Amino acid sequence: MTLLNQKPNSKAPKNGEFLTIKTANQWIDEAKSKPIPKKIFGPFWYKEELCILFADTNQGKSLLAVQIIDSVTKGTSTLGLEMELPESKVIYFDLELTAKQFEMRYAQHDKDKDILFDHFEFSEQFLRAEINPYGYDVSVEDYESFLFREIENQTTESGAKILVIDNLSCVISDNEKAKNTTPFLIRLNNLKKMYGWSILLIAHTPKRNLFAPISRNDIQGSKSFINLIDSCFAVGESQKDPSIKYLKQIKVRYGAFQFPSENVVVCKIGKESNFSSFKFLEYGKESEHLKHFDAADKAQVKNKAFELKESGYSNVKIAMELGVSEGAVRKWLKQAEIEE
């Protein structure tokens, strides 16, 4: 494999030295020579972090990812969030869209003539990769291993130190099972450490409870993934208006939570001229954008609670599933017993 201006850590352990042991003071002395991590997308994503961005389908994950890449490759901030790096090369592994679908998001459309014009101009530092269906030889190795190796090879050969993978579903055949995704995240973490890469991985969330705040339990596959990454944030949809989204921190390693439930970044998604993007509106509370119970909703949720109880769920687990308090579940079940 050819590396262009990019080498793994020269102090990497020799073959056979899987675990490197030093005193705590030695580790600290070694770390003193390394710079404090810089922000790539405000406090959501720092340099040399493995970060996951997740949301439900059609919530603008890919649009936000491209918006972040555009800011990094041009050395500018976006959404009022600090970007502390100089303009940098980024490689975007777009494993979902075709080139035409990508083009349509970043051009104006003359509906009368049915043509695209006034295309948005990205930096030449922005590299995009998509799958060549003729490039995979099924007889050589399994698809997931082949794709992972290609991601490593193409990134090292490009010289990029920042990469975005869109998305996890296209890399892992069954990412609802932790046993399938855990090895992939471990391998990504190893690449991050070997090459000093900054990695943003896009993931879906299964259909979630719109009455409850977004949490690590909503990430596709398993909340245990959180333990394998450095940071994580989510895009939520406002129940006031589907074009309004909010960004919420789920996990941080550097610093404190700046954008938890009580202080989410509220944006409006749309296309201005030739660029589909998020536009900053305000900071707000997540509770203002969640679905709220009315009489019909409450009856539906109570019935669901009864179904879950019959399925063997504990009161605590029912409360977590439905986004209500454990006390409310206990009250509903007690009322049901009295009515019987």
Report residues per predicted region.
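Conserved inter-motif catalytic segment of the P-loop NTP-binding fold
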Residues: 18-19, 85-176
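Conserved ATPase "switch" residues in P-loop NTPase domains
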Residues: 73, 77, 192-193, 309
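Activation segment
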Residues: 101, 172, 209-210, 258, ...
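Phosphate-binding/switch region of NTP-binding enzymes
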Residues: 52-53, 58, 63, 85, ...
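The Walker A/P-loop phosphate-binding site
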Residues: 12-109, 117
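C-terminal regions of RecA-like/P-loop NTPase motor modules
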Residues: 5-19, 157, 239-340
